[in-house]
Structures are given as structure tokens and as C-alpha cells.
Amino acid sequence: MNVVGYGGGTDSTAMLVGLWRHHVPVDLILFADPGAEQPHTYAYLDTMSRWLENHGMPAITRVWYTEKNGQRLTLEQECLRSGTLPSIAYGYKKCSLKHKVAPQEKFCRHYQPCIDAWEKGEKVVKFIGYDAGEERRLLNALPHDLQDKKYQKEYPLMEWGWSRKDCIQAIRDAGLPLPGKSSCFFCPSMKR
């Protein structure tokens, strides 16, 4: 069972293109929607969905954070409710964990092919789109990855040696426009 966490940006788009080019099977593509992505990211989902369909890959499944009562809670609603900025403004990544990682994990916990893999004692392969210039991110993730009993994390862009420049070229070679920076429109760490 192979799962892609798709963020709608350059790295994860290039990763999907590369997985297709390398004939790596993809069973599930998840986009965790915090409800506050840049408008161009939402528009790009349609572009990428058409490309995926034309290349025989699965559709993008959108997931989001829900409260215990089942109601969707966007990151913006959470910030307005608490009267604070996103946690990244204070040096934490709680917003990504809560609104990106947790909804994907919750979906997989209830997704029968993942359940079947775990019941057989297998790990679900989760592809992460860190390009070859992001070794620090990989090193930070490794201790958690090694302890993870449910997922085998793989970093194909690093495995292929794809730099940011290579990712951009792969997207262009696939006939796709560049996606633009994906981030919440009010993220304090957003770069231009």
C-alpha cells in the first residue's frame, strides 16, 4: 500500500511526476486541506487532478481536521477562536501536525486497504516530498520514522538526487505549469 502526502507545491508535484516516470505504484494521494491555502494552490489541485487522471494515477483525496463532534475546523477558525497566530509564529509546528499530518493519519486509520496491510503485519509506505537539498528535514524526521510501527517513510526525491531545480524541470517536462508556493495565506513563515 503506497500513499502520497500531496501538499500542492513544487516538491510534492515533482514527486508525483517522478513516481509516474519511475513506474512506482501509487494507491492513495492525500491532500490535507487546512482551509487556508493560497488560492493558487486550490486552483492547482484541479490542474494536477487532470494530469493524474490522464496518467492513470489515483485521484487526489482531500482530508481535513475535524473536531470530536465531527465538524470541520479550519486553521483560520482555530486562530480566530483562540485569538492567536498559528503556532509556527511561536516556533512550533503544531498547525502542520494538527491540520496536515493528523487528518491524513485519521483517514488512513479508517481506510480499508491500510487496515488490511496493518492486519497482515505490513507497513504502509508513505512517500514524502523532500528534495535533495533538504537533508536537515530528513535528519530531523529520521528518529520518528525509525520508531514508526505503521508507516515506512520513503523520500524519493532524495533517493533520485532531485534538487529544487530538478523538481522544477520535471514538472515542466511533464507539461505542467509550476504550482507556486503552497502555504496558508496567513502563515508567518511564508516566503515570497
Residue ranges of model-derived segments:
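Nucleotide-activated chemistry modules centered on ATP-dependent adenylation/adenylyltransferase
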Residues: M1-R192
